[in-house]
Amino acid sequence: MSKLQEIIIEAFERRADITPRNVETHVKDAVMEAIDMLDRGTARVAEKKDGEWIVNDWLKKAVLLSFRIHDNQFIKGGFTNYYDKVPSKWADANSRDFREGGARVVPPATARKGSYIAPGVVLMPSYVNIGAYVDSGTMVDTWATVGSCAQIGKNVHLSGGVGIGGVLEPLQAAPTIIEDNCFIGARSEVVEGVIVEEGSVISMGVYIGQSTRIYDREKDEILYGRVPAGSVVVSGNLPSKDGKYSLYCAVIVKKVDEKTRSKVGINELLRDI
């Protein structure tokens, strides 16, 4: 464990006593270093190792501590102003910073300090919260939201109005993860640490949390908290045992084929900056 991790973990244990006025310099410096690491993408709240997603809880603790050590402050917004503890990711950016960063940011898209936006990302008017990681080639479409610490893979399309849940508390919960080459349909919600594995397609209006039944009709089995790689998922219902009513579920109707991929493929013309 690094010294940085030790400082943050120790401070988190006494977080209730920490305020912007009494926080020690070394704690504040450690928290801001962790936030900067998240902001640059050199550290991630969750990362895949040997096929498994590993959560770095100490970084989640750093994000939570950042709210304890800052007062709300006046934040200029050009056409409007804000009042918050966390500044905008690009509060002090100039045109050169944007060119070197390689992402396209369409007004009034917002990303908070401590989120990472990789080169080749397109942010339509959308929102990316602190601790989130958005990888290269991804489109975050209009009114989509990427919650705190959520992990979005490469070449993902988050359609209009999509909600990707944030998970800062409880700390043992894993963040919501959308792996590479996924398509999330308009107005769908993926929350509570659910993992959508690589190459999956989620249809419009599908809601998936940890308690949502995910029914694989080919295998006639029910999953929770995970959409297997290459799945095509739509909203549906499963009947009760007595047949008197049905309850919502997500249905895996098939695995992705080339025809489906061609329909949801990334439009490179829209990604070129």
Curated annotation (Swiss-Prot):
GO molecular function: 2,3,4,5-tetrahydropyridine-2,6-dicarboxylate N-succinyltransferase activity; nucleotidyltransferase activity
Principal location: cytoplasm
Residues binding substrate: R104, D141
Subcellular location: Cytoplasm
Domain of life: Bacteria
Keywords assigned: Acyltransferase, Amino-acid biosynthesis, Cytoplasm, Diaminopimelate biosynthesis, Lysine biosynthesis, Repeat, Transferase
Protein name: 2,3,4,5-tetrahydropyridine-2,6-dicarboxylate N-succinyltransferase
Organism: Thioalkalivibrio sulfidiphilus (strain HL-EbGR7)
Gene (UniProt): dapD
